[in-house]
Regions:
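Patatin-like phospholipase
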Residues: 1-22, 30-206
Length: 206
């Protein structure tokens, strides 16, 4: 969905001046910010599977460790710093030990992407100094406030709200449903505060 919006912008001759993201949107934003063509990003997305880019984690602050995702990112983009992106980029995470929103605009890109996609309970938090970082969707699922701070005059967000939930069949699906419910409530509370929120219809996918 994120890539479809970017493609529509390109077809209209529009190019974002700033990009922000969390979760899968953070991955899409990062690869695009570093200049990867949309078709290549889509192909990478087809190769990416959480259980193939994770390893069993012991001792467990999460069932899995997503360090393999970091290696996946570095394989295709190299050992980049966030601040090196041609399009200014911000990745939103949450410090699970304090509940604080943590916006990453500098530092290791692969480490930041591990953090912003870190589903709490499924993946172990990513250690960043004293902070324990997880998926920023917990605090701002459509991270547009940071774009204003970066200087954007018009902000366009893509919301992948769950809206409908599937009956969970295992522990991981229970955790994901719980997070989706929480982030959907965050989305509702944020509506009306931004310039444009796009809500692609995804019911027929997945």
């Amino acid at each position: 969905a994120h890539l479809g919006v970017l493609k529509a912008f390109e077809e209209e001759g529009l190019k974002p001046g700033f990009l922000s993201g969390t979760s899968s949107g953070g991955l899409a934003a990062a690869f695009y910010a570093f200049g990867m063509p949309l078709e290549e990003i889509r192909d990478l997305g087809d190769k990416l599977h959480w259980l193939r880019v994770s390893t069993l984690n012991v001792p467990r602050l999460g069932l899995l460790n997503n360090s393999e995702l970091g290696r996946f990112v570095e394989k295709y983009l190299g050992s980049k710093k966030i601040e090196e992106s041609p399009i200014p980029l911000a990745l939103v995470t949450c410090d699970i030990s304090t509940g604080e929103k943590v916006v990453l605009k500098t530092g290791s890109l692969s480490q930041a992407l591990m953090a912003t996609t870190c589903i709490p309970g499924v993946f172990s938090p990513v250690q960043e100094g004293e902070r324990m970082l997880v998926d920023g969707a917990l605090v701002e699922n459509v991270p547009l406030t940071v774009l204003k701070e970066m200087g954007a005059s018009v902000r366009v967000g893509v919301s992948l709200g769950s809206e409908s939930y599937r009956k969970p069949e295992n522990m991981i699906q229970v955790i994901i449903n719980a997070i989706n419910i929480a982030t959907d409530q965050t989305n509702l509370a944020s509506e009306g505060k931004f310039d444009f929120i796009l809500k692609p219809q995804l019911e027929s996918y997945g």
